[in-house]
Design a protein with these regions (language model features):
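Positively charged n-region of N-terminal signal peptides that target proteins for export
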Residues: 1-4, 140
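Sec-dependent N-terminal signal peptides
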Residues: 4-13
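Sec/Tat signal peptide C-region and signal peptidase I cleavage site
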Residues: 15-19
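Subset of outer-membrane beta-barrel
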Residues: 20-314
Length: 314
């Protein structure tokens, strides 16, 4: 089992570089499922849009999604890995919103080797998270949200399970168009380990702010992530994004993730380069019933990813 896990984790180095410091499991939960969030650097918890994928970043944002909205997502990740998601949102009265969602990562087929690095076969690996989301207007302009999730992971014949919650809070001032959020993600733990040792959840605390300017069709966003790791430098917490709002329904965005750029940098001194990792771009159209959002980014110096979201309100 140790050889299998080692080969598996090594092939996904880009996902777990920083996570390995705390030996966390289920690091697919760190990846964005929202194309809009991905376009703005990969981390955003404050954009207020009728976009069902945004509630995977902050459960409080489910309150902005139209009644009876279906959303699906797909990302070609790296090394044959594919990341997918789906959701359904339903409003309950004027203040409450409920949703169900699923996140699925398929890592494809990989080599299984023995202690001498001799191939003995192949194995598949995948992660699944099934989620229930609830958002409620706590006060004027303030919405709270919670996501309860069941996670299971398969590496060959080995399986682990976990339960967790996300807690989100958003304050949105529509006249000045300020949005501020606080989110705690992946609070919980394993209920079944691969073997004897129980792993940790990829817990994260994030704070974010977005501001749309009345005189300009521009929205700026800043998000601080991994605030439980006090020893990181400030840049490793920072994610910046900008939206150009072409109309009420159409946006173009770009972002920069300082930590990802630093982690993906290869080479030494003047020859060091992240090969574009850290930068991301995207765009979308959110009509009354139909939504389409796309983002391009590099989660590894040697590969690129495209994330697509589709939504439809019945």
């Amino acid at each position: 089992m140790k050889k299998i896990v080692f080969a598996f984790l090594s092939s996904l180095f880009a996902t777990v570089v920083r996570a390995q410091e705390s030996q966390t499991e289920y690091n697919f939960l760190r990846l964005p499922l929202s194309a809009h969030a991905a376009a703005l650097g990969g981390e955003n918890i404050t954009v207020i849009e009728d976009d069902p994928s945004l509630m995977f970043s902050n459960p409080a944002l489910a309150a902005s999604v139209s009644d009876r909205t279906v959303g699906i997502s797909y990302m070609n990740y790296m090394h044959g890995a594919n990341y997918m998601g789906a959701s359904y949102t339903k409003t309950l009265g004027e203040k409450a919103t409920v949703a169900g969602g699923v996140q699925y990562m398929n890592y494809g087929r990989m080599k299984e080797t023995d202690e001498n690095n001799v191939q003995t076969g192949t194995f598949n690996a995948s992660d699944i998270a099934v989620e229930g989301i609830f958002a409620y207007e706590l006060a004027r302009n303030i919405v709270g949200g919670i996501t309860a999730k069941f996670i299971t992971s398969y590496i060959g014949h080995y399986n682990s399970m976990a339960v967790g919650v996300d807690l989100g809070l958003n304050w949105y001032e529509p006249e000045e168009q300020w949005s501020v959020s606080l989110v705690a993600k992946n609070l919980g733990g394993q209920i079944k380990a691969y073997e004897e040792d129980y792993g940790k959840m990829p817990t994260d605390v994030q704070v974010g702010v977005s501001k749309t300017f009345a005189a300009l069709p521009v929205r700026l966003s800043a998000t601080l992530v991994d605030l439980t790791h006090y020893n990181y430098r400030l840049a490793d917490h920072l994610d910046l994004g900008i939206d150009l709002l072409l109309s009420e329904s159409i946006w173009i965005g770009a972002g920069y993730n300082f930590r990802r750029a630093d982690e993906m940098t290869v080479g030494k001194a003047e020859d060091a380069s992240a090969h574009g990792a850290g930068f991301s771009i995207g765009g979308g159209i959110n009509l009354e019933r139909f939504k389409l959002n796309l983002a391009y980014g590099k989660y590894h110096a040697a590969s690129s990813s495209v994330l697509v979201n589709l939504g439809y309100s019945f």
